[in-house]
């Protein structure tokens, strides 16, 4: 699979789940050698408003990694290192960023959980 096409598909998923913002994705560091292999992958999800202006306060970091045969995702807010972060493996778990302790889903958390489910579906075909 072509990386540009894959990133565009992930951006479309973010656009759908995180309205009204538009999104672009880029690798944060080295891309994996092959999509869907066991390599770890970190991406930045960059947000823009409907006028095309950057909204860095809405940017997310997405980590994709495998633990054994299980695919895991971690999403966190780039601009707010203390905001709860989402780990999504076989189910969604919200954690305090500082302590790693489990916490309640934040008010805007359902959209991020939906994004993780869409990303997992896209990666299933990778």
Question: Language-model segments: what does each one mean?
Answer:
Residues 2, 80, 105-108:
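Serine/threonine-rich low-complexity intrinsically disordered regions
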Residues 65-94:
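Short, internal acidic amphipathic alpha-helical interface segments
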Residues 90-126:
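Ampiphathic alpha-helical segments that act as solvent-exposed interaction surfaces
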Residues 40, 49, 84, 100, ...:
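Functionally constrained cores in energy, signaling, and assembly domains
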Residues 14-15, 29, 85-86, 95, ...:
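Amphipathic alpha-helical interaction segments
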Residues 57, 74-76, 99, 124:
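Generic alpha-helix signal with a bias toward terminal, lower-confidence helices
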Residues 51-53, 58-60, 81, 91, ...:
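Basic nucleic-acid-binding interfaces
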Residues 1-61:
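Negatively charged, low-complexity tracts enriched in Asp/Glu with abundant Ser/Thr
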């Amino acid at each position: 699979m072509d990386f540009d096409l894959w990133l565009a598909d992930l951006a479309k998923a973010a656009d759908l789940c995180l309205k009204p913002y538009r999104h672009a994705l880029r690798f944060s560091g080295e891309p994996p050698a092959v999509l869907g292999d066991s390599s770890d992958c970190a991406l930045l999800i960059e947000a823009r408003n409907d006028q095309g202006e950057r909204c860095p306060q809405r940017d997310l970091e997405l980590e994709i990694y495998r633990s054994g045969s299980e695919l895991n995702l971690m999403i966190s807010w780039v601009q707010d290192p203390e905001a709860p972060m989402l780990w999504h493996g076989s189910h969604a778990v919200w954690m305090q960023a500082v302590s790693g302790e489990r916490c309640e889903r934040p008010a805007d958390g359902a959209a991020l959980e939906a994004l993780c489910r869409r990303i997992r579906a896209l990666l299933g075909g990778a």
